[in-house]
Amino acid sequence: MTAHRDAIRTARSLVVKVGTNALTTPAGVFDAGRLAGLADAIEARMKAGTDVVIVSSGAIAAGIEPLGLSRRPRDLATKQAAASVGQVALVNSWSAAFARYGRTVGQVLLSAHDISMRAQHTNAQRTLDRLRALHAVAIVNENDTVATNEIRFGDNDRLSALVAHLVGAEALVLLSDIDGLYDSDPRKTKGAKFIPEVTGAEDLAGVVAGPGSDLGTGGMTSKMSSALLAADAGVPVLLAAAADAASALTDASVGTVFAARPVRMSARRFWVRYAAEAAGALTLDEGAVRAVVHQRRSLLPAGITAVSGRFYAGDVVELRGPDAVPVARGVVAYDATELATMMGRSTSELPGELRRPAVHADDLVAV
């Protein structure tokens, strides 16, 4: 067993993401029995001393049959109605499954807004931490019923990566109907090559990933992207089939493992890089790009050539090179209107109260 798999096996805290297809029959019907089987595997890991947070998809699928729908809805309003009905069935099923072991579950519904706003982000972290301290099993899902756009987290793949860092998990396990990463879809391509371990971008050369299924939204593209996000932040990831949950959670001997970067990203830098929504953008000249990206220096107003968006001091903004390609993200120190009058000007030309960097190096993350 490699050191990367060993990191999954020995992790003292896990986030386990359960995909929609792991909770439904081949006919697309929500199956509480499948959920109970996964709960058994998760319970075994918890009994061994590991703290587990569950990110569970399946609310929309669980609402299809009770509402008399013939298939997963396509429009947002019906998706939200199905999620509203299905979330009740979903969390009740998790509650019943863990009640067999004397455990209590807590439901945590998050939206992209909750993750992107620093105050809500911190409150969500506190809630999850308190649930764990009280020995309740947190069941996290996207709050589909209040979403203003189409479901965005990719069947919760991205959400699970964000939650893993949010709670300080030592590993993330993605369980679905896919037994790991291949260079192409093994269901469509004969001889597709299985990739047991991803340690760098070179391992993904030539990989062709596909979209999600009719019941779920998270295809291999979503899973791969989310796994790389978590790994880049310092959280090792195991992608495995739900049918292999017992092995995945016991010894990590199945699936594809994504190796984590050696040094875990700080909570603040992770939020800036991955969770926060950019409120605007700053275009930089070549010299400023070199200073920010390669020399890890603060961004000064002199290096800014354009300001776009409506943002305020403390917001996260995207930093772009002269070619408009994003090069970094950071917390801006000035409002957009204020910065527009400062850009391109030397610090010595500015009043004393405006001589702070536009974005301090401590609040910058290269992308």
UniProtKB/Swiss-Prot annotation:
The keyword Transmembrane does not apply. This is Glutamate 5-kinase. It is an enzyme of class 2 (transferase). Its main location: cytoplasm. Belongs to the glutamate 5-kinase family. It catalyses: L-glutamate + ATP = L-glutamyl 5-phosphate + ADP. The keyword Membrane does not apply. The lineage of its organism: Bacteria, Bacillati, Actinomycetota, Actinomycetes, Mycobacteriales. Residues 279-357 form the PUA domain. CDD domains: AAK_G5K_ProB (cd04242), PUA_G5K (cd21157). Its EC number is 2.7.2.11. It comes from the Bacteria. GO terms for biological process: L-proline biosynthetic process. InterPro entries: AceGlu_kinase-like_sf, Asp/Glu/Uridylate_kinase, G5K_ProB, Glu/AcGlu_kinase, Glu_5kinase, Glu_5kinase/COase_Synthase, Glutamate_5-kinase_CS, PUA. Pfam families: AA_kinase (PF00696), PUA (PF01472). Keywords: Amino-acid biosynthesis, ATP-binding, Cytoplasm, Kinase, Nucleotide-binding, Proline biosynthesis, Transferase.
